[in-house]
C-alpha cells in the first residue's frame, strides 16, 4: 500500500514547529529509512500515519484514505507501528496475549489469528516465551514482542521506530530478515533509525531530515555521499564507506558484498 505526505506541517501546542512542509510519495512495497539527529522531526512525521498526530497543514494518505478524521483504530488495520519504547504498546500478562490482541481487534477469525500469532512468534524467536510476562523479559526481547504484535496484524504498511536499538548482533540480523520478508510480501516498510549500517544494507531509499525538513532523498549510496547533508543532519556514513574513505578509495561501498567485490581492484592497484 502506498503512502503520501503532501506539504505536511506539524506544530506542537508549545509553538514548536516539528515538521515543515514535507512532501513524500512512498510506493507500495518500498523500504524507506528516515535518518537524522534526535529532534529532526522523524517520529513526529511518521506518527501521522497511525493517527497519533493530525497534520497542522497538508494531508497524509495511506492508500486511498486521508488520515485526518480517521481514528487510530481504523488506521491500525492499514498501518502497524512498532514504537521505539516497547512498553508503550505492551500491556498483557503473557507475550502471546500481547501478540494476539491485534488480530482479535481487527476481527480475524480464530484460524487466521492463531496462524498469524504463531508465525509472528516464530519470526521473532519468541515461541518459547509465549507464556512469559513481557516485563520479565529483557529490553531487546520486549522490543521483539512489540514487533511480533505488529507482524501478527498483517498490515500492508509497517513502521519501525529505532528497531535495532538495544539489539545484539543476532537481533539485528533477525530484524533485517523480517524487513526482507515484509518486502518480499509486497508490504511497505518505513523505518526510523540511527543505525546507518542497518539502513544502508536493508533499505533502497533514505531520507535525511534536520529541523523538521527533508535534506536529502535518494538511494543510500547517493545520500551518504553528500557531506553537507551528513553534517546538517548530524549523521555519519556507514562504517564501510568510512573505511573505504580512510583507505583512499574513490568509491564508497555500503555493504559487505560491495566492499568485498571492490577488494580485487584495489589489491591490484596496490601491487
Regions found by a protein language model. Give the residues of each.
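H-loop/switch region of ABC-family ATPase nucleotide-binding domains
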Residues: 193-194
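Helix-to-loop junction immediately C-terminal to a conserved catalytic motif
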Residues: 50
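Conserved ABC ATPase "signature" C-loop
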Residues: 211-212
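Conserved ABC ATPase "signature" region
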Residues: 111-129
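Conserved ABC transporter NBD signature motif
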Residues: 58-67, 75
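The feature captures the beta-strand-to-loop junction immediately N-terminal to the Walker
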Residues: 35-37
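Conserved ABC ATPase signature
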Residues: 133-137, 141
Amino acid at each position: 500500500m502506498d503512502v503520501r505526505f503532501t506539504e505536511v506541517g506539524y506544530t506542537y501546542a508549545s509553538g514548536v514547529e516539528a515538521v515543515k512542509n514535507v512532501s513524500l510519495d512512498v510506493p507500495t512495497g518500498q523500504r524507506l529509512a528516515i535518518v537524522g539527529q534526535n529532534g529532526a522531526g522523524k517520529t513526529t512525521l511518521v506518527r501521522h500515519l497511525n493517527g497519533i498526530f493530525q497534520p497542522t497543514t497538508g494531508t497524509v494518505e495511506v492508500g486511498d484514505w486521508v488520515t485526518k478524521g480517521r481514528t487510530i483504530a481504523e488506521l491500525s488495520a492499514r498501518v502497524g507501528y512498532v514504537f521505539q519504547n516497547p512498553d508503550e504498546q505492551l500491556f498483557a500478562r503473557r507475550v502471546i496475549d500481547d501478540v494476539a490482541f491485534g488480530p482479535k481487534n481487527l476481527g480475524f477469525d480464530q484460524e487466521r489469528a492463531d496462524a498469524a500469532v504463531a508465525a509472528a512468534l516464530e519470526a521473532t524467536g519468541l515461541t518459547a516465551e509465549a507464556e512469559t510476562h513481557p516485563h520479565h523479559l529483557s529490553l531487546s526481547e520486549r522490543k521483539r514482542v512489540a514487533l511480533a504484535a505488529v507482524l501478527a496484524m498483517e498490515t500492508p504498511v509497517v513502521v519501525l521506530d529505532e528497531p535495532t536499538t538495544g539489539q545484539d548482533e543476532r537481533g539485528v540480523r533477525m530484524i533485517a530478515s523480517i524487513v526482507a520478508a515484509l518486502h518480499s510480501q509486497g508490504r511497505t516498510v518505513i523505518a526510523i533509525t540511527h543505525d546507518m549500517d542497518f539502513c544502508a544494507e536493508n533499505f533502497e531509499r533514505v531520507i535525511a531530515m534536520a529541523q523538521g525538513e527533508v535534506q536529502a532523498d535518494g538511494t543510500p549510496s547517493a545520500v551518504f555521499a553528500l557531506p553537507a547533508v551528513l553534517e546538517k543532519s548530524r549523521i555519519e556514513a556507514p562504517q564501510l564507506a568510512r573505511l573505504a574513505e580512510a583507505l583512499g578509495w574513490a568509491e564508497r561501498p555500503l555493504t559487505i558484498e560491495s566492499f568485498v567485490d571492490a577488494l580485487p581492484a584495489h589489491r591490484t592497484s596496490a601491487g
